[in-house]
């Protein structure tokens, strides 16, 4: 995780992640699900790194190492700016925890390169999606 911060003053809010280097990024896209609790998973690439940033709301993000099937879970939120690195040879998925959650994915490959390297799995292959809401 690449940590950021936010500053609030009389003008508004500034969110930033100053330690993120865009040199490997060739494209980006924003995803917003229609409702809280919707799952988009599992999608991976053998040769593409992804960087995940929650612009609005919060999400449970899962990352699976495709060699070992080790699973990692992260909660990303607009209240604590951070960028999650999803390395090549991994699958990822997410479930938004709030209505209106928006996530930006930064990718190291062009769309044409990514299409040649696309790996998909059913959303419940690694079922990490149970959350206790308080």
Located regions from the model:
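Non-catalytic, conserved peripheral segments adjacent to functional cores
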Residues: 1-82, 95, 99-134
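Glycine-rich nucleotide phosphate-binding loop and flanking beta-alpha elements
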Residues: 92
